[in-house]
């Protein structure tokens, strides 16, 4: 029996409604992360699920690093972003043991390096990765770069050190607050009236004078950071400037990162 014109119109309407219904059923694809490890990474981690941001501030004691982090956390959380902070010697697994070992100066350089790497790996696996998976902004008060620079300044093999930290995630942004050793001395003395044994490189035996040792050691660290900057592409910030100017520069850059760009 031939189809009537009315039936044809009704059929077309049904097909149109079906097509409209199917279009409504389309699921918006999830936002996938572009995270990568520097090397072998951690097995069985789905990088695509790490949708948060990892932001690192590097710099010596007295560089203003902690002050900037406090300001950035307040700013980020005030704008509705959940944040988590990590840093050197904050692992619940080994931080206390590492502190005691340093006080007694009882570890070889290789063992000390492995101790710090364990501290980092524990935080990476149990804090950084779960937080990124939950969509948090992770602020790292120093990362693998300080640990690598310390090892390299103390004569460790460059390739060995690079391999040791190849499990690290590549951050979304890294900022190195570059402050002159002379300025660092003034800031540390103003804050604590003393210089730290390890931050002065006294274990290297360069000189018995702690002030001279501090300047020499921090200069070596500075040179190592600038060398690493070429390989790891992080942003060097003039840390001798006014704290407010640095803060505004960091906020501008981090806003760029939050918009989906990599610094």
What are these regions (language model features)?
Residues 147-220:
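A glycine- and Lys/Arg-enriched "phosphate-lid" helix/loop adjacent to the NTP-binding pocket
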Residues 84, 173, 235-237:
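Structural signal for short hydrophobic segments within the conserved structured cores
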Residues 58, 177, 239:
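Catalytic metal- and UDP-sugar-binding loop of GT-A-like glycosyltransferases, i.e.
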Residues 54-57, 137, 174:
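Hydrophobic "anchor" residues on beta-strands that sit immediately upstream
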């Amino acid at each position: 029996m031939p189809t009537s014109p009315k039936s044809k119109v009704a059929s077309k309407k049904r097909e149109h409604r079906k097509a409209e219904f199917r279009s409504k059923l389309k699921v918006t694809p999830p936002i996938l992360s572009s995270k990568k490890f520097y090397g072998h990474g951690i097995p069985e981690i789905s990088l695509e699920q790490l949708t948060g941001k990892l932001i690192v501030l590097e710099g010596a004691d007295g560089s203003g690093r902690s002050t900037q982090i406090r300001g950035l956390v307040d700013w980020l959380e005030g704008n509705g972003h959940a944040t988590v902070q990590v840093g050197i010697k904050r692992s619940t697994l080994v931080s206390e043991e590492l502190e005691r070992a340093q006080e007694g100066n009882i570890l070889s350089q290789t063992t000390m390096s492995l101790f710090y790497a364990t501290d980092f790996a524990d935080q990476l696996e149990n804090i950084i990765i779960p937080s990124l998976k939950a969509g948090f902004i992770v602020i790292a008060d120093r990362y693998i770069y300080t640990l690598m620079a310390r090892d390299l300044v103390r004569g460790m093999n460059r390739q060995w050190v690079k391999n040791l930290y190849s499990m690290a995630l590549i951050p979304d942004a890294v900022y190195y607050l570059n402050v002159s050793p002379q300025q660092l001395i003034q800031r540390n003395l103003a804050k604590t009236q003393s210089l730290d044994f390890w931050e002065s490189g006294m274990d290297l035996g360069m000189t018995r004078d702690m002030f001279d040792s501090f300047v020499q050691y921090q200069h070596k660290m500075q040179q190592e950071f600038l060398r690493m900057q070429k390989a790891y592409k992080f942003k060097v910030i003039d840390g001798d400037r006014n704290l407010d100017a640095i803060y505004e520069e960091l906020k501008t850059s981090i806003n760029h990162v939050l918009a989906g760009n990599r610094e």
